[in-house]
Amino acid sequence: SERAWRMAGSKMFVELGSQIKVEDLIRGVIIQSGNDACIVLAEAISGSEQQFAELLNDTGKRIGLTNSTFRNSTGWPDPEHKMTARDLSILARRIISDFPEYFPYYNERSFRYNNISQDNRNPILARVPGADGMKTGHTEDAGYGLVGTAKRGDRRVIMVVNGLPTM
């Protein structure tokens, strides 16, 4: 959509009117933090980003997110859009357990789409032994955040850090 194509912030550089594999969009969201990819997926799943946010809120309640409110698919600033560190950890655990087929994407170091290669923004992947995912985020208001995961032996560790001045 034109809305996805014009979206500011991080992008995977989806071209207006192009056809894209769902797998590429998912990788664009996970690896590149592509706001454009988020919107394309939201519109495909629910018809509009607003309807997708409603789906996120309903699903969040169902899986035990008690202090989160979604207003968009990207995390773009909105006074009512919020998520606690605890809810982020619950969501991370559910993604890992419910969608294991997508978890390897969180450990990919880079993704190339439309002849543009972008590195994964997760700094712990290259620095922490056993680190294997998850996701970074940033807004001017909230600062930098990270949901990091690592596996040591049989133990999975999920770490949530929010409000950092730098990553």
Which stretches of residues belong to each language-model region?
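Active-site-adjacent loops and short helices of periplasmic peptidoglycan-processing enzymes
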Residues: 1-86, 96
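Domain-terminus/edge residues, biased toward the C-terminal soluble/receptor-binding domains
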Residues: 65-69, 77-82, 86-167
